[in-house]
């Protein structure tokens, strides 16, 4: 997209923030694409050293002044809210996010601890898993506020990602 803007002669300074593996993203998959980004961007910001290292794979000139790591942050909790016996899973309901492991595990847990419940927030139309239990509640995709409200009720949040998670925002939340 940056190259498109440059070709259109857009006079602006570009700052890119990478929060996923750049080698899997259109416009930064190849060494030449990434070298063009270095040349044409004022700053490149990465959410972790891992993401930055991936970006520079195969590139000799690192341009340290243009490239920085800024870790995502949260506001510290001053008072922990009273929690319920709820285990939460939030995210896409697919294999890369580990939903297949969560689903089979949560059924065993809910069978053993009948006073616990689990909520699942998210969806995934491309993959279908059918985990059912009377204490397993699917909420679908919710707004950020509703998701955070449910997080505040849950005692446990599970993030079993199966891919190279550059910086799991779900775990941070």
Per-range role (PLM):
Residues 152-166:
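Acidic donor-binding loop of glycosyltransferase active sites
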Residues 148, 171-173:
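Short alpha-helical segment that forms part of, or immediately flanks, the ligand-binding pocket
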Residues 45, 74-97, 103-107, 119:
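Conserved donor-binding/catalytic core segment of Leloir-type glycosyltransferases
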Residues 27-66:
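A short, active-site helix/loop in glycosyltransferases that binds the activated sugar's phosphate group
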């Amino acid at each position: 997209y940056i190259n498109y803007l440059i070709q259109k002669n857009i006079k602006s300074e570009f700052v890119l923030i990478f929060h996923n593996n750049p080698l899997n993203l259109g416009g930064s998959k190849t060494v030449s694409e990434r070298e063009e980004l270095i040349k044409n961007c004022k700053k490149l910001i990465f959410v972790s050293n891992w993401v930055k290292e991936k970006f520079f794979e195969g590139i000799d000139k690192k341009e340290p002044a243009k490239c920085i790591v800024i870790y995502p942050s949260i506001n510290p909790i001053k008072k922990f809210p009273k929690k319920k016996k709820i285990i939460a899973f939030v995210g896409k309901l697919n294999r890369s996010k580990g939903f297949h492991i969560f689903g089979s595990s949560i059924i065993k847990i809910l069978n053993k601890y009948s006073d616990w419940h689990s909520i699942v927030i998210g969806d995934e139309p491309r993959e279908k898993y059918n985990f059912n239990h009377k204490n397993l509640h699917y909420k679908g995709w919710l707004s950020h506020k509703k998701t955070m409200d449910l997080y505040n009720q849950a005692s446990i949040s599970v993030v079993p990602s199966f891919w190279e998670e550059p910086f799991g925002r779900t775990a941070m939340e």
